[in-house]
Regions:
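Gly/Gly-Pro- and Ser/Thr-rich, intrinsically disordered tail segments characteristic of DNA damage-repair
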Residues: 1-226, 364-419
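Short, charged/polar surface micro-motifs in flexible loops or helix N-caps
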Residues: 10, 33-35, 294-297, 349-353
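Short, hydrophobic beta-strand segments
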Residues: 104-108, 306-312, 354-358
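DNA-contacting surface of Y-family translesion DNA polymerases
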Residues: 182, 192-338
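C-terminal hydrophobic structural anchor segments
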Residues: 323-380
């Protein structure tokens, strides 16, 4: 049996743990730079606030309904996630952390009753130890566990956060009530294909011939069909899958037209992306830089410029990556235009252990030692204690986060004081 554990409205729940007066109130969490809504409490969902809603467009709705607004505090959310996952790992050894708020479990050697009991114990313990509410779906396959979790979350008064698809009747009922677009692994393109032949529910999908599914949705689609039929084709992934590309992008608080300001932004993004690259012990050999206008302007005032270039050598050095990124920026920059967003994407990733030395390598060992020293200082004293020359030395541009909560669990001077 497989279980899918999902933290309910995770970001909003994290804020409520340390501010219990928020219970029952609508909450929205905003993206980087306080741009768009990326998470909502159930109360906010009930107000019709959609995911991705531009914050400025919903300002009056927020005010009228007394919506509590928070800037995204990923330091807090990441730490709370680690605590939740640590608790879960005490119950079952076979754990796959799927995302910041989701994990799969495999119950090998458990009877059905034992697995049910263990799931309910996890819900109770996570709530008691962290204050985070979780829902669990249990089923014979990972794909069905996802659907079982959906049932558990949709009917909390009946399920109390736990639902098990443990027989054929429950499986068929759940598949009959879920649309193809809501099935994990279907995707937008496949949903369109299925809709074109009047396949709109999970039941419709599993009734398709295997040959059609394999031909039109590849072997991956066929595996999904088998999963929904109750035959496991996906197992717990215990090894960490490294990212195939790394991006750092931001919208600006106000439009930027100066090349100097854009260089500072791209350099800072390069430093952040390079650090992510080193954290997963990878190197890149391709870089894409883009700049674009405000998407809410008139059509004739919208523009997007991007350029991708190949490095002469693989690297994870902030110095080399930022230098190359700035060169790309200068090629796409246009005067007399204003820009609202910029970003850098690192591609062509490979393990740093596979590095092949070439004539183009520039004191590679010296740069590795330098990057290691910078990372050590950053980890100990915070980001940007050591900066590149093209980063602003008087101030480092920071995201607009006017509604940021405290780092209750990671900063000693921000912990709650009990009087």
């Amino acid at each position: 049996m497989f279980a899918l554990i999902d933290c309910n409205n995770f970001y909003a729940s994290c804020e409520r743990v340390f501010q219990p007066h928020l219970n029952g109130k609508p909450i929205v969490i905003l993206s980087n730079n306080d741009g768009c809504v990326i998470a909502r409490s159930n109360e906010a969902k009930a107000l019709g606030i959609p995911m991705g809603a531009p914050a400025f467009k919903f300002k009056q709705i927020f005010k009228k309904n007394k919506v509590e607004i928070f800037s995204s505090n990923f330091t807090l959310y990441g730490d709370m996630s680690n605590r939740v996952m640590s608790i879960i790992s005490r119950f079952v050894p076979d754990l796959e952390i799927y995302s910041i708020d989701e994990a799969f479990l495999r119950f090998n050697g458990f009877t059905e009753d034992e697995a049910d009991k263990k799931c309910k114990e996890i819900i109770s313990t996570v709530w008691k130890w962290t204050g985070i509410p979780v829902s669990i779906g249990l089923a014979p396959t990972k794909s069905l566990a996802k659907i079982a979790n959906r049932v558990a979350k949709k009917n909390p008064d009946i399920t109390e956060g736990f639902y098990s698809i443990n027989n054929n009747k429950k499986r068929l009922k759940a598949l009959g009530e879920i649309s193809t677009g809501d099935i994990w692994g279907i995707g937008i393109q496949n949903e369109k294909k299925l809709s074109n032949i009047n396949v709109n529910s999970g039941i419709d999908f599993i009734n398709l011939p295997d040959q059609w599914v394999k031909k039109n949705m590849s072997i991956i689609g066929l595996k999904l069909k088998k999963e929904l039929e109750g035959s496991p084709t996906l197992d717990i992934e215990e090894t960490k899958v490294e990212k195939k590309s790394i991006a750092t992008t931001r919208s600006f608080e106000s439009d930027i037209s100066s090349l100097e300001d854009l260089i500072e932004r791209i350099t800072t993004y390069s430093v952040v992306a390079s650090k992510k690259l080193r954290n997963q012990k990878s190197e890149c050999n391709m870089i894409c830089v883009f700049i674009r206008s405000n998407p809410f302007k008139n059509n004739n005032e919208r523009y997007h410029y991007s350029l991708t270039g190949s490095l002469p050598f693989s690297t994870n050095s902030s110095i080399e990556i930022s230098k190359f990124a700035v060169k790309l920026l200068k090629k796409i920059y246009s005067k007399n235009k204003s820009y609202k967003k910029a970003g850098i994407i690192l591609m062509g990733l490979s393990p740093e252990s596979n590095h092949q030395f070439s004539l183009f390598d520039r004191d590679i060992e010296k740069q590795k030692k330098l990057m290691k020293s910078i990372d050590t200082i950053d980890n100990k004293y915070g980001l940007y204690k050591v900066r590149l020359a093209s980063q602003d030395q008087k101030r480092i541009w920071k995201m607009k986060r006017q509604k940021l909560s405290r780092n209750y669990t990671t900063e000693i001077d921000e912990i709650l004081i009990v009087k």
